[in-house]
């Protein structure tokens, strides 16, 4: 009985400690830096530059590790400034220190308007059109115009502005610097993973904002085209009539069944 009481007392003390905001905190954060798995092309480039032992390794869990990291130059780290015991001057390293509401706004800006919706559009159309690299898709005038319209034309009128980062400049960097980066070997197949879990957030929030603002989302054309592209992708046949493997998705069976049903109806 004494042991049980002692254990219960310890648990209570720990709970009190964790719940005391003057003692400990759990700041919210948002990080944005595209970092795909290590690519053989990057390893080869490093070898040509005289750097040895750069070969990526596939682990027993099918994850990829390497002595190098594929990472882009632009990076954003936004942290809720709630540290009751003090903190380093993270601002000097380029970290945005702000309040919780602003962290959420930055996340919403990125996920619903300025980056993720563009990525998903390129992912589904990239698979259908036979692309292996996201960067190469930006050489296609129609795909490039599609993502510009999604982000800059349709997204900006209802974008969440966090104040600490300018949405238009952020989106412009995404479109003109980050996505076209030829040294960022990201694939449409990777980004197409779990699309059923993403569509509602990446496009639905903008659609809802238009309805709330104008009473209708009929002004949108690029966003519906991106969603239609996902439905086309779910058929699993590219534009050369060749079958391709769909990326992993927890609702793949349901999504594919519905898409095939609707395709037969039309």
Give the residues covered by each predicted segment.
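Primary mode marks residue(s) on the alpha4-beta5-alpha5 output face of response regulator receiver
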Residues: 10, 16-104
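A general structural signal for short secondary-structure junctions and capping/turn motifs
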Residues: 14-20, 65-68, 104-106, 112-115, ...
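Catalytic or ion-translocation cores adjacent to nucleophile or general acid/base/metal-coordination motifs
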Residues: 5, 9-37, 132-158
